[in-house]
Structure formats: C-alpha cells, structure tokens
Amino acid sequence: MELKSSSNNNILEQLRNGFARFELVSSPTASVSDSISSTSLPASFISTTKGNSYVFFARINSSMNRSPAAKKVEKYAVDRVKGDGRCLFRALVKGMAFNKGITLNPQRERDDADELRMAVKEVICNDPKEREKYKEALVAITVDESLKRFCQRIGRHDFWGGESELLVLSKLCKQPIIVYIPEHEHGRGGGYGPGFIPIQEYGSEFRGGWGKGKTNKNVVRLLYSGRNHYDLLR
C-alpha cells in the first residue's frame, strides 16, 4: 500500500509541475474495466454508458523523452524570475515580450502576469462553453482537486501555476512553449553540466506554417528549476 501511494504521489507531482501530460485511455470491456478497482481512481475518471463501465486513466506521455531532441543538451542564458507565486506567469510574459523585442519593467511584468492568471480563470471557471475547449487542462486540474477548489485558488497571486495553466495558455495565446530542466537533473552521470534538457512541449501546432489562420511564433522556453519555480531561458 505504501509503495502504491508513493507511486501515485510521484505521478501527481509530475503532472502538477509539467513534467508529464495526460493521455486519456478508456476501456469499455469488462475484462479490463473490472480489473481496475474504482476505489483507486478519482470518481471523475469513471463513467457508465449503456451498462458498460468506462474507466479513464492517466498515462504518462513521454514522447519528448523518446525523441532525439530530448537527448540533446541545449544551451541558453537563464533570466531569473521573482519567486512570488507568479513565477510561471512572469516567465511567460517576459518570454513573449522578449520575442517581440520588448523589455518589461517590474510593474508591467507583474500586471501582465496577473492578467495571464485571470485569463486562465476566465476560460476555465467563468465560461462553461469555453471550458470545453480545454479538456486536457480539466483532467490535469481534477486529478487531485475539484474544479470548484481550483477556481477558488487560481485567482490568488500565491497559487503556483503548472501543467494545467500551461495547457490553457499555450492554446489561448497560440504560443508554443517548451519546458526544460537543468542538465544535471537529467541523471547524466551525476555531473553538473551547464546545459538544459527539454522535457515537455505545449502548443507545438503554433510553431509555424503558412496560409490563412496559420501562425509562426517563436518558442518561449521555460526552465523548471525545482521547488515549483520557473525561470525564463533565452
């Protein structure tokens, strides 16, 4: 039981911090559904249709870890971000401004970060119709808390952003985002190299293209440097 709890906690931590993404898998067959105890899953993961029990569960999406790009160490400068609970949002607004050749002053950075936070709240909490466009984010949110609880907390400046907010903002802003970790945290021989390893990408569909409705935006690169803190890479 302790081993199972530890494993579940590890998965939840990866999802909260953006290291993992949900891949929804369902099984309408009794042989599979019955083998998974409903007591081990949140109630929101289970539904019944025409007598069949459908079990929806999270599978870690490790596509970046399998890709050649994920094996490559990349070098960037670290732009430190204030750790006041807004770090994810601050890093994003700084990165988007930097890509446009704009430098934000401290007050503008804070205000823009708070606007991003409230944009997440607006589409997820205040507009049920819009909410349906962000199903992956909804699953990431409700894996360990209710939507109501999330909506009570997201408006607070000290509520950290993570996986669900990245899923929303990459789509809402049509902004490609890649999250990195320091090279030494990737377990490469236990060394402390100066590079960074990409672990997850959001909004890849907005990285380029031509034609009506297409965008070609520069990537915003975020460094997850532990303890729920994000900095900007550039």
From Swiss-Prot:
The keyword Nucleus does not apply. Residues 81-87 are annotated as: Cys-loop. Its EC number is 3.4.19.12. Residues 76-234 form the OTU domain. GO terms for molecular function: cysteine-type deubiquitinase activity. Residues 154-164 are annotated as: Variable-loop. Signal peptide: none annotated. Optimum pH is 7. Keywords: Hydrolase, Ubl conjugation pathway. InterPro entries: OTU_dom (IPR003323), Papain-like_cys_pep_sf (IPR038765). Residues 224-229 are annotated as: His-loop. It comes from the Eukaryota. Hydrolase that can remove conjugated ubiquitin from proteins in vitro and may therefore play an important regulatory role at the level of protein turnover by preventing degradation. Cysteine protease with a preference for 'Lys-63' over 'Lys-48' over 'Met-1' -linked ubiquitin (UB) tetramers (e.g. Ub3 and Ub4) as substrates. Also cleaves RUB-GST fusion. This is OVARIAN TUMOR DOMAIN-containing deubiquitinating enzyme 3. It comes from Arabidopsis thaliana (Mouse-ear cress).
